[in-house]
Amino acid sequence: MKKIIIILILFINSVFTQKILIPMDQTQNDHLKAYGIAYYALNRNINVEWLLNFQGGSFLIDNHSFIQAECKIRGVTFLEIGNDLLDIYSTIEQNNMDIVILEKAPKIAIYSPPNKQPWDDAVTLALTYAEVEYQILWDEEVLDNTLENYDWLHLHHEDFTGQYGKFYRNYHNAPWYIEQKNSFESLAKKYGMKSVHEEKKAISRIIKNYISNGGFLFAMCSATDSYDIALSLENVDGVHSVFDGTPIDNDIVNKIDYSKSLAFKNFTIYTDPMIYEFSDIDYPPSHNPITRGAEADYFSLFEFSAKYDPVPTMLTQNHVPIIKGFMGQTTGFNKNMIKSHVIIMGEDPASDQAKYLHGNFGKGTYTFYGGHDPEDYQHFVGDPPTDLSLHRNSPGYRLILNNILFPAARKKEKKT
């Protein structure tokens, strides 16, 4: 009998040494590349346990030598776990924590134009630095119905209203602006559409259908509000004649259909081409910014019930609860214009600004994140891209990477 017990103990110990813990608290050397390790494991059909609210949202992975080697190469902190595994599970069970099983590496697409633009894209930077695979799509691929091949779609500094980013006032004579305008017009004509705004609104509806069928959308900066505006206008001409050669619909105010937008309601559209702003959704407004400066601008994350609200809990995993603010063409969202079903996950508690939103539509979801680059407070046209090796523990960039793992989560019944 004693021999059996000893064998059993040895067996249990051997099982319990077959896990690697990737801590995501302040002890982690490179938070951003840690997400890449999780994706690396999923790509090799190895499940990952995401320990929600445990040490900043840590990862638990089977202890394979090649994963250890990859962690060392990428500079990711990891620990081999033995008998402590039971203590970890017990801690999770007794606190506002939970375990989500990640099962399959999501197929990721980034919506980005083929011609180089004079600004960076935070998500492309994050995925590249974290060594996560992605494909770049543009309008042709969307119009040719290839979105269904991807689990997750990202939109960044794009303009779905057909106003070329509302850069007319300062850049309409710039070579990059003229090239972009000509390219967009040629593409619209190729697909039999009379204007760029008509073509962009068609794109927005296809993306909405993609979400409805189970897709995951993540949008930042101007791709958030301009997208919802495009959905709400549909067949209405809401752009100035300098953009399409035709006048704005005289009854545009009464023709906005807020029921067609995803997240926002009761907003006012700014049609003046000289105003660098789409609507009053943006807070603070880009054309009249009221900022406290980089040293004083912060937003806070809400804490959700890990066992009852796993989705917003996943999307807000971090090693700090308060994050540096950052600006963009769309810096944040006016709380008064957010639909009631939308979950606010991050906000400036001292103002009407929401920074980070999540909602469901059909079988899928969307997440909106205000601002352009979490580690560049005011990212201007022509600025060099951010070097993420200098910001490898960025809390703001972590929110982006939470979103790429979200589609990999095993669905489980919601507790009641």
Residue ranges and their predicted role:
Residues 17-121, 371:
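Hydrophobic targeting/anchoring helices
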Residues 101-104, 145-148, 210-212, 337, ...:
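Extracellular/periplasmic catalytic domains that process cell-envelope and extracellular macromolecules
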Residues 18-60, 335-416:
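Extracellular ligand-binding/catalytic regions of CAZymes and related secreted enzymes
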Residues 19-20, 25-29, 60, 64-69, ...:
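Helical hinge/lid and interdomain linker segments adjacent to catalytic or ligand-binding clefts
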Residues 166-303:
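A glycine-rich, often tryptophan-bearing local segment used as a flexible ligand/cofactor-contacting loop or short
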Residues 91-96, 140-142, 351-355:
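Alpha-helical scaffolding within the catalytic cores
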Residues 3-13:
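Sec-dependent N-terminal signal peptides
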Residues 118-121, 128, 225, 255-379:
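Catalytic beta-strand/loop cores that center a nucleophilic Ser/Cys/Thr
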